[in-house]
Amino acid sequence: MTLRVIDVSANQGLIQIAPIDCDAVIVKGTGGDNYVNDCCDFVLQQCFKLNKPAGLYHYAHEFGNINDPVVESNFFIDNCKFYFGKVLVALDYEVAINGRNYTQQDVDWCYNFIQNVIKRTGVVPLLYISKSLISECDWSKVANANVGLWYAQYADNNHTGWLSDPWDDGKATNPFTTVMHQYTGHGRINGYNGDLDLSLFYGDVNAWNKYANSHDKPISNGGDNVNSNDYLTAFAKDVLAGKYGNGAERKEKIYQAVQNKVNELSK
């Protein structure tokens, strides 16, 4: 059993999910220590309404800025905490720390990022990397933390649609367990007029939900668990930061955010 997965970012803007021929959607949430995808919630709320499996990823070293892994993971969690436990999460690691080749320093960075996510949320993220990186470094410490692999490997850069058995070089992915294969960045599928990243998830909806629901404790703020006042404070800070616009637009977005939660809890 496999799921056909698209992953999207702000490049796709306010993409409409319902018409698209896919089984699951992963959306970029944050990047580095200062980038938030303003379209993320719009996409995820559609997935929740459609009862479609959803995921969320953080892009490491956004804009080429090399930050402390705990700083980046805290930024990811703090901006996306309301989704943890509902969606699969992943770390997207593509930029080498030294700007050239990947070393054990990159492995350590990923490990520390992931460990902080686990510590604060209980959720074990997937790791997204190019398949070629697996043989360049020793990833055992990451894999031994029960981190599943979402790897990218393309046959070419031609347009393609959904494939049940996409090309792969046949090399082992040890020490990882492969969870997902992104096989093109030029996917063309029904319901969207443009290129999309296409992946196959090797499992069913229940398997997806196990990755999403792996946490067993409230999300902490790095110390004590977050209570309702902390959530309200975080929400208010988002409002003050302009994430909900101004005037009538702000009122509508705040109302909609609360109403979406009410609708979700009343199901």
Residue ranges, per PLM feature:
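Functionally critical loop-and-helix segments that line ligand-binding/catalytic clefts
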Residues: 1-19, 142-227
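Substrate-binding cleft of extracellular glycoside hydrolase catalytic domains
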Residues: 1-123
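Flexible, glycine-rich phosphate/dinucleotide-binding loops
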Residues: 33-34, 63, 134, 158, ...
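Short secondary-structure boundary/hinge segments and terminal tails
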Residues: 65-66, 135-136, 266
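Catalytic domains of cell-wall/extracellular-matrix polysaccharide-remodeling enzymes
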Residues: 87-168
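Primarily a LysM-type cell-wall glycan-binding module
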Residues: 231-241
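Extracytoplasmic Gram-positive cell-surface binding/anchoring modules and repeats
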Residues: 240-251
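Repeat-associated, polar segments at repeat-unit boundaries in modular proteins
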Residues: 255-267
